[in-house]
Amino acid sequence: MAKEFSRSQRVSQEMQKEIALILQREIKDPRVGMATVSGIELSRDLAYAKVFVTFLNVLTDNADPDTVKNGIKALQDASGYIRTLLGKAMRLRIVPELTFAYDNSLIEGMRMSNLVTNVIKNDVERQVNPGSDEEK
């Protein structure tokens, strides 16, 4: 029976769960806020991991880009501690070196959804009032 997923995919899924728990329970830095792990890119040799995070406070507050930069900086500063806790939780021979990156796909998805909603709303308005657009 062939393996459905490679080892690096299985490890990255487990690592995503563990890092999410660590961020939720262990990291007390206020700059991090409510960070969620949206994905992990793991190298084939499991030596490097790029952790993609989103910040829920950025989604709700329309926060400035400095909030994101400060959050990523705080996570990068705590990466050694997170790596230590990850090593204890997962019992890997080699714990990957962690780098954190902001994942803006959720915000972009919301922006695209709003654009589509506005276009549909404008289209419905044009169908109801067909002559009002030509006068403008």
Curated annotation (Swiss-Prot):
Its function?
One of several proteins that assist in the late maturation steps of the functional core of the 30S ribosomal subunit. Associates with free 30S ribosomal subunits (but not with 30S subunits that are part of 70S ribosomes or polysomes). Required for efficient processing of 16S rRNA. May interact with the 5'-terminal helix region of 16S rRNA.
The entry assigns this protein to a family as follows: Belongs to the RbfA family.
Tell me yes or no: is Cytoplasm among this UniProt entry's keywords.
Answer: yes
| Protein name (database record) | Ribosome-binding factor A
Question: Pfam families recorded for this chain?
Answer: RBFA
Gene Ontology BP annotations: maturation of SSU-rRNA
Which gene does this sequence derive from?
rbfA
Q: Which SUPFAM superfamilies match?
A: Ribosome-binding factor A, RbfA (SSF89919)
| Location in or out of the cell | Cytoplasm
- From which organism does this entry originate? Yersinia enterocolitica serotype O:8 / biotype 1B (strain NCTC 13174 / 8081)
Q: Which NCBIfam families match?
A: rbfA
InterPro entries (alphabetical): KH_dom-like_a/b (IPR015946), RbfA (IPR000238), RbfA_dom_sf (IPR023799), Ribosome-bd_factorA_CS (IPR020053)
Q: How does it assemble?
A: Monomer. Binds 30S ribosomal subunits, but not 50S ribosomal subunits or 70S ribosomes.
